[in-house]
């Protein structure tokens, strides 16, 4: 039989095997050269065919005409093998399902090659599949490429050039307008007078408001878009001085000079409250205010980009550079920050345009749907769309659309009045009739009135302050008023008369451009041409006017036609702003062209260019406001005026009263605040130690301000949580919970839990990478340990290996509790508040519902609960501790609702993230250069046996770490006027309602309280630390937190040479905030979060000194193989050493060596020879010791109560005793118990001086047996533990 390799016969052929040599049948394949006899027969047939051919007369050159006989479908089918059919079926299924991502692990590409290669050569099927394969390969890469490297293409150019790399001037500023429609028909030889057109079909006699109550803000937004796209050159009207892209040119300018005029050239910032395009000052104040909001948003973005410094893109220049090199580096950094901030800011601009603006245009804001018309939708081969609308190819705006976007009929009554007053301001009273001459005079006056320097410009009567900014109160007042003003309606006879000369110019401009007429324009977009004037507008007066002006609908000009057209009636959804018929269709086409053609909003719009944080900062979430993001702009620009859920900020494009109806109809009104925006309470920062104590200890003058957040999440019961208020009820709640938290057994239960859990998590979550142990000590240890704690104590549905039916994973439950905490105690970022509160309420209700169900089950029928672990309460002191707490709350008279919503859930939420943060910040400081010198001492203390002295010392170091690195503070609200005397001598007046923020950062460095504050002193008095708060609302869980922190520190610093992993993953990614505070980045660096999220540490190879490392990571040594079913035995062994507080590697090695020897390498739990009744366990203890051992175990003690000796016990009774103590969780604990309880102190002390001496004393004096037979096992254990 042929030799096989990997299941395929060598060389692809297989010789025939005779029946005698093979027991399996195989298809015979001929050898390549075939059989000699068959070749002769075939050659003869070919000669016979050739002899029958006619003479070659057809071609003229004496040759035969070649006729190619291609193999047919039948031949291809015959050649298909079973695996080929399977491949073909998979290809067809993928096509039908529209799958675009191949699983290359299935080798589908290679199997396709096999399929095609096996078909008949040159068959049509083979050719078709080959062509399809080549097309797929070809289409995987752009031809030619449209994306290029380098700043020239990465950043927007001031004039909009290079949007299309192959046509760099396509759509650039100062290039000609395009023409959308080719004019084919003839127009009237004598066109009607523009003034007559205005007076008859344009002019507003009485204001008609928009039928959908669209506010003036939408028209302000449209004004920005219009000025972004159109700026007709005065000397050459065919030229557009703006780019054809929505690049926010009104803010940034369309020339390098304009762009530079608003830059500070420092840190990528813009000059305060400036914008480049002076034309916008000639619009109602709301328009420039929107641009100022974008200015502020840009500076917010630039600041955060620099602070986050993703990938080192915005690092400050090195100090050693020459002055010239440093100057160049600073300039490059400024440019990088400015241009990246522009990309991000423009991203928000386009998202507001495509979501908020377009949703209102087509009335999607009135329905509960997340569907949106986003032109950036991916299509084409990559996503399985057959017909491709290309993207990122560029755009050129047309002259027709220059006229289509003149929406002057939409001016509100207020803005009509403003324009009139503006002309009066420019020209004075009694300036005469409003005509072209008057308008040109006004334009000249306007041009002269606007300063060349953007930072000196003013508008709307607003004045700049010393910092260059306008007064926020005045800007917000103007904005709120505009939001409340409905705009005008589309349709004939609604253009304010003050706009007459501008409209006349528009008519004249359309004629000079020789644009197609209204009907030609409509037909181009697939709309039916108007046949009568009544089709254009059913209002008889408008139809008659048009008839008298134009004679026939085909003669109606484009601009007069689209202004005079009838407006659509609102439709839900479909028609929102109620535009005229033609406008409603063409504006959507233009929106798609503008956005889809813009490379910076499509193919180059990604986190790599905007940074992860920048991309996410402006991205929309369809779960929040159906994707609307206008609130991000409002709340970043005016964080002290708009509430996080203000309807004025979230839906400013519709007047508030109409929004109330809309949101009520879609059942969302309860999420929003409908009050007018007003300045929020003043925040007063207090930094002194004594001032902090003064505020926190006087709850009459300074009350807690967490009730609203608690009620939002927990309902009315949340208002009864101890931290919700300052009444006698809240004090009683605190007293009750404190009594239940700190019972007689709390310290041992908490200490044992954290000691075991810390080591368990370090073992389970760590991994070996490049020869070193690593673990994410924040995400997978610190955060998770506290999550396990509250889950065990409050019986929460945590999914673990022990409780696989739990509902929430470790990370999910931690995040739920963190979100709850932030929503209640740290909801200080208005721009993030709304989505945070909505998400927090959803998860809090879900978790609270499960807890409430379980509490009811436990109180009614005694069931532990659904989806929770079922530990034996006698074997789980923490669970028993938590159960007693719940019973105590019930006994105190609390209802199930109160137990859950005013106690368990808020307490869990308050405990976990705060304690996790304490651990992360403290550990981070000791791993930093500042704390490095203290690490050897921490490692020494952590290696010692636990005890009051070592615990106090370890806690002292932890508390000092918090003092050095902790960023903690608390808010209080002043109940009345007061004066706070700061530690530095300042007197700070306070008024009722002021929010006072007490910072502990500077207070922790007060030399009067902490002498030598820059030095770590682990023996400082604990009562001096105030980062847990002081006064009636001091952290109730402080003592628990300190025990937990001590055990976490012990577990981490037992690791040999513990340190950060190299690079960014070893750093706690922080973003600085004023006052010495920090916030943190999520792991993807896409969002800022109040709590640490990730930091990886490593430690040296070797067994180390902690139990889990000893027992899990030293597997290469022989003794490990002695453990039976290690995954089951190890936890019990570790738990027993932990419970007996044995941490010395020498003692652990000795006990394990003895147990392995006595149990015959853990094969036996009972005495095998001579078969002594009652003798057994892994430690092979005599019956009298097993009785003592059983009585030391709470759940076994009751069964042996009253029996003081094994004397007189029957063999059956001795067997029962042995059955009890040889259950795995007790069997492997016998050795540690024996050492701890039966050996004298001098034996254990001997291990500390000399390992071998200690083992000898242990075997001979304590166990009382021969040393020599047991030395081999001890030597193996010593080798394993590096002793």
From Swiss-Prot:
GO biological-process terms attached to the record: fatty acid metabolic process; response to oxidative stress
Cofactor: heme b; heme
InterPro entries registered for this protein in UniProt: Cyt_P450, Cyt_P450_sf, Haem_peroxidase_animal, Haem_peroxidase_sf, Haem_peroxidase_sf_animal, Oxylipin_biosynth_metab, Ppo-like_N
Positions annotated to bind heme: 1035
Chain spans, region Fatty acid alpha-dioxygenase: 130-476
Record PROSITE patterns: PEROXIDASE_3
Catalytic activity entry: (9Z,12Z)-octadecadienoate + O2 = (8E,10R,12Z)-10-hydroperoxyoctadeca-8,12-dienoate; (8E,10R,12Z)-10-hydroperoxyoctadeca-8,12-dienoate = (12S,13R)-epoxy-(10R)-hydroxy-(8E)-octadecenoate; (9Z)-octadecenoate + O2 = (8R)-hydroperoxy-(9Z)-octadecenoate
Active site positions, chain numbering: 405
Record CDD domains: CYP_LDS-like_C, linoleate_diol_synthase_like
EC number: 1.13.11.-, 1.13.11.62, 1.-.-.-
Binding, heme b: 227, 408
Annotated region (Disordered), positions in chain: 1-64
Pfam (any one): p450
Region called Epoxy alcohol synthase, residue ranges: 684-1108
GO molecular function, one term: peroxidase activity
Keyword terms of this UniProt record: Dioxygenase, Heme, Iron, Metal-binding, Oxidoreductase
Assembly: Homotetramer.
Known role: Bifunctional dioxygenase (DOX)-epoxy alcohol synthase (EAS) that converts linoleic acid (18:2n-6) sequentially to 10(R)-hydroperoxy-8(E),12(Z)-octadecadienoic acid (10R-HPODE) and 10R-HPODE further to 12(13)-epoxy-10-hydroxy-8(E)-octa-decenoic acid as the end product. Linoleic acid is oxidized mainly to the R stereoisomer of 10-HPODE.
Family the entry assigns: In the N-terminal section; belongs to the peroxidase family.
Protein name: Bifunctional dioxygenase (DOX)-epoxy alcohol synthase (EAS)
Organism: Fusarium oxysporum (strain Fo5176)
Lineage: Eukaryota, Fungi, Dikarya, Ascomycota, Pezizomycotina
């Amino acid at each position: 039989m042929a030799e096989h390799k990997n299941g395929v016969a060598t060389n692809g052929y297989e010789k025939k095997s005779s029946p005698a040599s093979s027991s399996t049948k195989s298809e015979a394949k001929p050898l390549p050269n075939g059989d000699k006899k068959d070749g002769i027969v075939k050659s003869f047939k070919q000669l016979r065919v050739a002899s029958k051919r006619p003479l070659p007369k057809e071609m003229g050159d004496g040759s035969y005409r070649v006729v190619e006989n291609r193999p047919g479908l039948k031949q291809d089918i015959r050649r298909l093998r079973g695996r080929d059919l399977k491949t073909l079926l998979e290809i067809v299924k993928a096509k039908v399902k529209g799958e675009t991502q191949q699983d290359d692990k299935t080798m589908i590409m290679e199997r396709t090659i096999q399929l095609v290669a096996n078909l008949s050569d040159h068959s049509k099927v083979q050719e078709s599949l080959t062509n399809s394969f080549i097309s797929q390969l070809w289409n995987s890469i752009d031809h030619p490429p449209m994306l290029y490297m380098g700043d020239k293409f990465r950043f927007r150019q001031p004039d909009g050039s290079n949007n299309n790399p192959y046509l760099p001037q396509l759509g650039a500023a100062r290039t000609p307008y395009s023409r959308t429609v080719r004019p084919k028909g003839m127009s009237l030889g004598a066109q009607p007078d523009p003034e007559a057109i205005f007076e008859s079909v344009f002019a507003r006699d009485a204001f008609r408001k928009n039928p959908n109550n669209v506010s003036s803000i939408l028209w302000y937004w449209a004004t920005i878009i219009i000025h972004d796209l159109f700026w007709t050159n005065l000397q050459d009207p065919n030229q557009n001085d703006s780019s054809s892209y929505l690049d926010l040119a009104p803010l940034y300018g369309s020339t390098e000079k304009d762009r530079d005029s608003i830059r500070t050239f420092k840190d990528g910032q813009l000059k305060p409250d400036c914008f480049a395009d002076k034309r916008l000052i000639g619009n109602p104040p709301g328009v420039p205010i929107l641009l100022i909001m974008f200015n502020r948003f840009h500076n917010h973005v630039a600041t955060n980009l620099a602070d986050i410094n993703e990938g080192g893109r915005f690092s400050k220049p090195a100090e050693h550079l020459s002055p010239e090199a440093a100057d160049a580096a600073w300039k490059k950094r400024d440019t990088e920050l400015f241009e990246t901030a522009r990309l991000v800011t423009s991203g928000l601009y386009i998202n507001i345009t495509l979501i908020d603006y377009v949703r209102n245009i087509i009335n999607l804001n009135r329905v509960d749907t997340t569907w949106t018309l986003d032109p950036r939708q991916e299509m084409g081969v990559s996503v399985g769309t057959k017909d491709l609308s290309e993207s990122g190819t560029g755009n050129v705006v047309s002259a027709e659309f220059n006229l289509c976007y003149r929406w002057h009929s939409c001016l509100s009554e207020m803005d009509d009045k403003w324009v009139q007053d503006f002309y009066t301001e420019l020209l004075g009273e009694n300036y005469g009739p409003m005509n072209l001459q008057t308008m040109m005079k006004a334009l000249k006056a306007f041009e002269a009135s606007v300063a060349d320097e953007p930072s000196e410009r003013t508008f709307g009567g607003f004045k700049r302050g010393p910092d260059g900014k306008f007064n926020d109160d005045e800007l917000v007042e103007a904005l709120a008023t505009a939001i409340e003003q409905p705009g005008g309606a589309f349709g004939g006879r609604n253009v304010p008369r003050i706009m007459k000369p501008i409209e006349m110019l528009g008519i004249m401009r359309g004629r000079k451009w020789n644009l197609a007429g209204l009907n030609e324009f409509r037909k181009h977009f697939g709309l039916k041409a108007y046949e009568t004037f009544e089709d254009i507008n059913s209002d008889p007066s408008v139809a008659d006017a048009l008839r008298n002006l134009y004679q026939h609908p085909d003669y109606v000009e484009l601009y007069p036609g689209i202004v005079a057209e009838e407006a659509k009636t609102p439709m839900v959804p479909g028609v929102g702003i109620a535009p005229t018929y033609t406008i409603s269709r063409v504006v959507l086409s233009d929106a798609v062209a503008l956005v889809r053609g813009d490379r910076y909003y499509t193919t180059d719009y990604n986190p790599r260019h905007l940074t992860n944080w920048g991309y996410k900062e402006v991205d929309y979430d369809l779960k929040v406001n159906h994707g609307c993001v206008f609130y991000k702009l409002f709340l970043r620009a005016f964080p002290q005026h708009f509430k996080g859920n203000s309807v004025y900020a979230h839906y400013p494009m519709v007047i508030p009263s109409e929004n109330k109806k809309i949101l009520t109809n879609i059942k969302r009104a309860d999420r929003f605040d409908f009050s007018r925006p007003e300045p929020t309470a003043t925040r007063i920062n207090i930094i002194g130690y004594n001032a902090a104590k003064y505020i926190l200890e006087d709850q009459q003058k300074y009350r807690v301000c967490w009730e609203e957040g608690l009620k939002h999440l927990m309902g009315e019961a949340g208002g009864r949580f101890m931290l919700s208020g300052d009444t006698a009820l809240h004090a009683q709640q605190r007293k009750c919970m404190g009594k239940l938290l700190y019972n007689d057994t709390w310290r041992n239960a908490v200490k044992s839990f954290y000691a075991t859990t810390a080591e368990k998590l370090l073992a389970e979550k760590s991994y070996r990478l490049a020869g070193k142990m690593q673990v994410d000590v924040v995400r997978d240890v610190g955060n998770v340990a506290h999550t396990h704690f509250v889950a065990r104590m409050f019986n929460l549905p945590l999914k673990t290996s022990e409780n696989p039916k739990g509902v929430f994973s470790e990370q999910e439950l931690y995040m739920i509790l963190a979100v709850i905490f932030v929503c209640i105690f740290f909801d200080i970022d208005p721009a993030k508040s709304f989505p945070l509160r909505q998400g927090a309420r959803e998860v809090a209700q879900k978790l609270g519902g499960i807890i409430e169900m379980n509490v009811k089950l436990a109180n009614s029928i005694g069931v532990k609960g659904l989806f929770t672990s079922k530990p034996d309460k006698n074997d789980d002191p923490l669970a028993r501790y938590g159960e007693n707490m719940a019973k105590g709350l019930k006994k105190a008279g609390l209802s199930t609702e109160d137990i859950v919503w005013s106690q368990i859930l808020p307490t869990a939420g308050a405990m976990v993230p705060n304690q996790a943060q304490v651990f992360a910040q403290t550990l981070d400081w000791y791993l930093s250069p500042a704390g490095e010198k203290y690490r050897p001492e921490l490692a020494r203390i952590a290696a010692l046996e636990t005890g009051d002295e070592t615990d106090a010392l370890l806690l002292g170091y932890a508390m000092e770490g918090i003092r050095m690195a902790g960023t903690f503070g608390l808010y209080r609200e002043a109940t009345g006027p007061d004066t706070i005397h700061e530690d530095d001598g300042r007197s700070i007046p306070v008024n009722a309602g002021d929010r006072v923020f007490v910072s502990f950062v500077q207070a922790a460095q007060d030399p009067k309280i902490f002498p030598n504050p820059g030095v770590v002193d682990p023996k400082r008095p604990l009562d001096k630390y105030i980062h847990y708060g002081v006064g009636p609302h001091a952290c109730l869980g402080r003592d628990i937190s300190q025990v937990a922190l001590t055990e976490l520190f012990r577990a981490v610093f037992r690791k040999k040479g513990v340190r950060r992993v190299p690079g960014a993953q070893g750093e706690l990614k922080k973003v600085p905030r004023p006052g010495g505070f920090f916030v943190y980045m999520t792991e993807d660096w896409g969002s800022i979060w109040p709590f640490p999220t990730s930091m990886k540490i490593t430690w040296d190879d070797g067994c180390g000194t902690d139990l889990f490392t000893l027992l899990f990571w030293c597997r290469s040594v022989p003794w490990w193989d002695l453990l039976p079913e290690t995954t089951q035995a190890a936890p019990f062994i570790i738990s027993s050493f932990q419970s007996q507080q044995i941490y010395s590697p020498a003692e652990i090695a000795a006990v394990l060596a003895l147990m392995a020897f006595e149990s015959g390498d853990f094969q036996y739990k009972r005495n095998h020879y001579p078969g002594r009744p009652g003798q057994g366990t892994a430690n092979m203890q005599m019956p009298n010791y097993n009785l003592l051992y059983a009585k030391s175990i709470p759940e076994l003690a009751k069964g042996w109560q009253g029996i003081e000796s094994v004397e007189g016990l029957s063999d059956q009774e001795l067997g029962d005793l042995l059955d009890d103590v040889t259950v795995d969780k007790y069997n492997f604990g016998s050795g540690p118990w024996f050492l701890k309880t039966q050996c004298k102190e001098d034996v254990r002390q001997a291990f500390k001086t000399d390992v071998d001496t200690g083992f000898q004393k242990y075997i001979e004096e304590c166990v009382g047996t021969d040393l020599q037979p047991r030395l081999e096992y001890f030597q193996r254990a010593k080798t394993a533990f590096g002793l």
